[in-house]
Amino acid sequence: MNRTRRLRLVLCALLCVLLCSCQTVLPANEKAQVEELLRAPKLSGDYGALQTALNDWLGESAQLKYPIQGELLSPFVLQDLDGDGQQDAAVLYTTAQTANVCIAILQRDDAGSWQVRQSVEGLAETVENVSLAQLQDTDSCQLVVGYTAAQNDHYLAVYSYQDGTLSTILEQQYEQYLVENITGGSSQDLILMSTQEDGSVQIELLTADREGSFRHVAVNGLSADKFSGCASVAA
């Protein structure tokens, strides 16, 4: 089997996973009630220390934003993001002055206390899901965040934290995404699925270089009238 056909078969299998995945989203009123309940309590341990450090840096109490689905359901992501061997922290939050979700990056100082290094504004007011990925051929780890806007539009952002700076290396509208090693390299790839205006389904396979620039490895488009399942992708 040649490389092109193998790649198309892999994309076919991934499309089946994406299309058949079941998502459970809380109604807006229930989600608001949950977040309001989670706003007030003081947390303990590292989470409490992170919350205090963020509030001190902001000069007000942040409202923590919980992803509504996925494997990572906490507003706190503890991970060595820049590959320096030290644990970093990303915190999802909003304030009275911000419409969209913000992401704060914190690191420990020499005394072991958490300190905010940077904060960036996200793409929408709701965090749909969060995942960690190794999309670059480095020791660093990227933060992949899916957002949902009020109009139910979905936006994906990939963040890279290097040399003390959090950079957005990808922003794109999407419906489903998957992180997987498809090309067989030393890093993972990003698969995006979206529906076009004419109803056709587009699948994009992207891979990143060491500098964080993404390039398209493959793009498959399936017309609405011809799409009949995975066989139409592999044909």
Q: What label would you give each PLM region?
A:
Residues 1-2:
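N-terminal hydrophobic targeting signals that begin at the initiator methionine
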Residues 5-26:
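Sec-dependent N-terminal signal peptides of Gram-positive bacterial secreted proteins and lipoproteins
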Residues 22-235:
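Beta-propeller-forming repeat regions
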